[in-house]
Amino acid sequence: MTDNKALKILQEFLDISEPTLEQAIEVFTPLTVGEYDDIHIAALLTHIRTRGETFADVAGAARAFLNAGHPFPITGKGLMDTAGTGGDGANTINVTTGASLVASAGGVKMVKHGNRSVSSKSGSADVLEALGIPLNLDPDRAVRQLEASNFTFLFAPAYNPAVAHVQPVRKGLGISTLFNTMGPLLSPGRPEFQIMGIANPEQGQLIAEVFKDLGRTRALVVHGAGTDEIAVHGTTQVWELRDGTISHYELTPEDLGISHHELADLAGGNGEENAKALRAVFAGTGEPAHHDAIAATAGAMFYLNGTTDSIHEGVTHADQLIKNGTVAAWLKKHEEANYGSADRA
């Protein structure tokens, strides 16, 4: 039952038309520790949806849940995370997950935060499991995995258990809420670099501002022609955060040095089917659209952490790593690895 103190905080927030960041943190903090009844959680989420999400709402909720979460033992400098909001209905192969493996093979330190499928046939965890990448590692083993391979996967529920308090309400409401964009913002690695795909381009500037507030040095927020990915089928809108400044621009497949493909060419299946498609790309026998989509997103990763000076150069670098066998060799070395507590040579 919601106590009087929490109810007072909620009531005051609902009466404010333009809350401050501090007020948003204050109203979401009781939610992180289960102090609101479901009906009061629903009131909060529907109020924000009706009023319209503000920077304070999103940043305040993110800060409250990060404060309640469990950070990864290694945080910050040099780390990257990448994920999308989902919800675009495209059901493509796991482009971002495949690209993150290419980036790791090329030296990017990837702390990928994700979950199993929610809005698609295959979530990042589903395809990684099918590829043989170890999941469900405790923090110490995950650190060893990162040190050995430049990649680790962090299951969202293990690091942000407080989100469970809102899940029954989200499911019951059946409508999009602020929490549809929250997942990628709660990265346990508190990374220096982050790429986030968004299904709704109207949120681009806002999300970039939230990344600035959360301390990201560089970030890319992308929306690709109706999808939460860099598009090979049309124009991608990009909001780039770099050293405190946010810029907005557009990219076409031609800008990236890749061919134009149809969105249908990226249609995916379940985790096993998508893993097969990724393996084919890494082996040099994949569908051209799959190859180009993965290279495009990996190219953005190489640009973001400074490996290359432009996304176009990053795409070329990713293409070379795939074609010369570096990525396939990386996967063969690190799939099914144990990362146990015993000393390794």
From Swiss-Prot:
It comes from Corynebacterium aurimucosum (strain ATCC 700975 / DSM 44827 / CIP 107346 / CN-1) (Corynebacterium nigricans). Keywords: Amino-acid biosynthesis, Aromatic amino acid biosynthesis, Glycosyltransferase, Magnesium, Metal-binding, Transferase, Tryptophan biosynthesis. The keyword Glycosyltransferase applies. Anthranilate 2 binds at residue 170. One of its GO terms (biological process) is L-tryptophan biosynthetic process. One of its GO terms (cellular component) is cytosol. This is Anthranilate phosphoribosyltransferase. 5-phospho-alpha-D-ribose 1-diphosphate binds at residues 84, 87-88, 92, 94-97, 112-120, 124. Mg(2+) 2 binds at residues 228-229. Homodimer. It catalyses: N-(5-phospho-beta-D-ribosyl)anthranilate + diphosphate = 5-phospho-alpha-D-ribose 1-diphosphate + anthranilate. Pfam families: Glycos_trans_3N (PF02885), Glycos_transf_3 (PF00591). Its EC number is 2.4.2.18. Catalyzes the transfer of the phosphoribosyl group of 5-phosphorylribose-1-pyrophosphate (PRPP) to anthranilate to yield N-(5'-phosphoribosyl)-anthranilate (PRA). SUPFAM superfamilies: Nucleoside phosphorylase/phosphoribosyltransferase catalytic domain, Nucleoside phosphorylase/phosphoribosyltransferase N-terminal domain. NCBIfam families: trpD. Pathway: Amino-acid biosynthesis; L-tryptophan biosynthesis; L-tryptophan from chorismate: step 2/5. Binds 2 magnesium ions per monomer. Its cofactor is Mg(2+). The gene is trpD. Mg(2+) 1 binds at residues 96, 229. Signal peptide: none annotated. GO terms for molecular function: anthranilate phosphoribosyltransferase activity; magnesium ion binding. Belongs to the anthranilate phosphoribosyltransferase family. Anthranilate 1 binds at residues 84, 115.
